[in-house]
C-alpha cells in the first residue's frame, strides 16, 4: 500500500512538472498602455530591439509604405526587423497619440533624418492580449 501511494505521488509530481514546462510564456506587454506600446514599436524600428516583437504586433498586422506601394504581413515585417536587429537609425524621433477611443488608438511617429523625414501612422487595437500594433502606414512628406 505504501509503495502504491508513493508511486501515485511521484506520478502527480511528474505531471505537474511537465505541465509547467509546456506552459506558453506570458505576454510581457499585456499590461502596458498604448503610449508604452508605441514606444516599444519605436524601439523595435529605430533602435533594432526585437525582444518583444512576437507580442508587439497583432496577428492581422499589416505594414504599408506609401512611397513605393510595398505591403508586408506580420511575418514579413518581423523577419525584416530581425534581419536589422541592432541597427540604430541616426534620427530624432518624436511621437504623439492622435486619438484613443475604446479599443482603438491612433499614433503618429516622426523620424527626422538629415536629408528626409519619415512619418509612421500607427494603429493599435486592444484585445485580451493587451494593446498591439495592428497597422503601420509609412509616408515621406
Predicted segment positions?
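Surface-exposed, charged secondary-structure patches
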Residues: 26-30, 78-116
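Short, well-ordered alpha-helical segments enriched in acidic and aromatic residues
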Residues: 47-60, 64
Amino acid at each position: 500500500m505504501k509503495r502504491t501511494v508513493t508511486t501515485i505521488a511521484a506520478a502527480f509530481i511528474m505531471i505537474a512538472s511537465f505541465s509547467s514546462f509546456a506552459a506558453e510564456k506570458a505576454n510581457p506587454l499585456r499590461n502596458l498602455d498604448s503610449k508604452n506600446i508605441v514606444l516599444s514599436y519605436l524601439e523595435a524600428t529605430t533602435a533594432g530591439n526585437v525582444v518583444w516583437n512576437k507580442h508587439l504586433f497583432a496577428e492581422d498586422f499589416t505594414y504599408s509604405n506609401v512611397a513605393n506601394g510595398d505591403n508586408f504581413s506580420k511575418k514579413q515585417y518581423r523577419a525584416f526587423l530581425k534581419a536589422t536587429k541592432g541597427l540604430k537609425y541616426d534620427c530624432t524621433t518624436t511621437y504623439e497619440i492622435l486619438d484613443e477611443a475604446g479599443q482603438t488608438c491612433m499614433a503618429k511617429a516622426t523620424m527626422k533624418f538629415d536629408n528626409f523625414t519619415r512619418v509612421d501612422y500607427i494603429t493599435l487595437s486592444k484585445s485580451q492580449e493587451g494593446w498591439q500594433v495592428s497597422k503601420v502606414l509609412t509616408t515621406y512628406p
